[in-house]
Amino acid sequence: MMQHSSSVTQEPTNPFGFVSQVGSFVFNNSCSRVSKSNFTLDSYSNLLSNYLYFDCNVKKDSLNHKNKPKASPLLSLSISNKSASSFSRVLFQFNKAIRFHCEKIPLGFASVGVNCGESNGVREEGSVVENEGIPDNGVESEPPKKVLILMSDTGGGHRASAEAIRSAFNEEFGDKYQVFITDLWTEHTPWPFNQLPRSYNFLVKHGSLWRMTYYATAPRLVHQTNFAATSTFIAREVAKGLMKYQPDIIISVHPLMQHVPLRILRSKGLLKKIIFTTVITDLSTCHPTWFHKLVTRCYCPSEEVAKRALRAGLKPYQLKVYGLPVRPSFVKPVPPKVELRKELGMEEHLPAVLLMGGGEGMGPIEATARALGDALYDEIHGEPIGQVLVICGRNKKLFNRLTSVQWKIPVQVKGFVTKMEECMGACDCIITKAGPGTIAEAVIRGLPIILNDYIAGQEAGNVPYVIENGCGKFSKSPKKIANIVAQWFGPRQDELRIMSQNALRLARPDAVFKIVHDMHELVRQRNFEPQCCPA
């Protein structure tokens, strides 16, 4: 068994502290003075989308850096109440600060030096250039389309979805597409914005801080203002990052990857040339920043998410409900349970429960494993009624503690695994937190799910999603969870079987293939040549 070193999470500062404080100041000090009759929670979310715009007129000679485009954000609010004047004054001061930074920092592709001539395979700014010569048969081949997937390692689900999409492109279209994955915030923004993943991990570990951040930034007025302010500091670096890949398709699998890139594309008139799609990786509840009206396509994992997208202003033709993209290996058949259990060192004919806590091995795994060790042992007959497969991920300390325990039942402890489809295929049910990717994979394998935790905000809706569809239960108590499993492996086996059938009905194993084929169709319909540089 391979052991992996555990990760150490430090406590960084919040890179969006300044922006959040300004947004909170605007919201708290202004909206509280506006009467409910004129400025309600139902109306303020529409204000900024109607009155926030950027004057980004780009001239043809902007590439020579003589006339750099400037972003001039202007906010104007029409509220027929005396208290509106104080609200407008605060926003005026906020806009003045943003305008100052916009004048200092050029925006968009025009601010990036691009050489469209002969480059011998190398462009300025480290651009990715492929060999597009003539093959040996003398016939010029069409260069592959370039796909850029934008993600961030804030949780494991975004990277997993990005990898699944890349694998599907490779399997379905081979060398017709070149797929690149980039962590936009870490790799293409300046400090402190490039500390986003570390800040997220810190906030999630302090649940109340994350809950406050999630819901405080949900109103459109707040997050649009935050993005407007943030863009003035990161737009140039983000533009360089996009130009590095010269993409034909941009795919966002993260809620913070829509607004800034789309603003840059719009400022350069590239929205009709570059396909921009969003693949939402939250099953039910999702943050409003997932939705942007300028996307070419928004792929929703469920009808509930599609309804949210419509309420956010997207049009029906922009939406496709295909399911959550999971790795293509989950679509392929796996060997029978007996064979998989033998390969994993498990008992071949004993019911098995899979216990996991994500890539970092988070959650009450040890307490739950010990409770299962007691509940799945028949004291009367002196024999086990079930077995446990524990996935510790990169949590080396947890791995060492569990492997040192003298168990009364068969317990297999694994570190970080890459073939999760085989681990799930070897088991009869699963205990996990409410991560959308794990839920989507579990229902494909027909596993009843016991959810033992969730992240406030984006994962909260996954609990009723599982329960209401009849494919699982929820409990935070290790003892209650162990008793549920013991019942499923004993007198309530029929309930386990019914939940397994419900899970299979909920599964969408081909979602990732439908997504990439729809993107391929968008490329075919648009029929544009890869862009060297904007005019």
Swiss-Prot record:
Transit peptide start and end: 1-113
Catalytic function, reaction form: a 1,2-diacyl-sn-glycerol + UDP-alpha-D-galactose = a 1,2-diacyl-3-O-(beta-D-galactosyl)-sn-glycerol + UDP + H(+)
EC class (word): transferase
Source species, domain of life: Eukaryota
UniProt xrefs under SUPFAM superfamilies: UDP-Glycosyltransferase/glycogen phosphorylase
Keyword tRNA processing annotated: no
Record's subcellular location: Plastid, Chloroplast membrane
GO molecular function terms attached to this record: 1,2-diacylglycerol 3-beta-galactosyltransferase activity
Keyword Glycosyltransferase found: yes
Main localization of the protein described in the UniProt heading: plastid
E.C. number: 2.4.1.46
Annotated Pfam families: Glyco_tran_28_C (PF04101), MGDG_synth (PF06925)
GO cellular component, one term: chloroplast membrane
Keyword field: Chloroplast, Glycosyltransferase, Membrane, Plastid, Transferase, Transit peptide
Disulfide-bonded cysteines: none
Example GO biological process: glycolipid biosynthetic process
Function: Involved in the synthesis of the major structural component of photosynthetic membranes.
Family: Belongs to the glycosyltransferase 28 family.
Protein name per UniProt: Probable monogalactosyldiacylglycerol synthase, chloroplastic
Organism of this sequence: Nicotiana tabacum (Common tobacco)
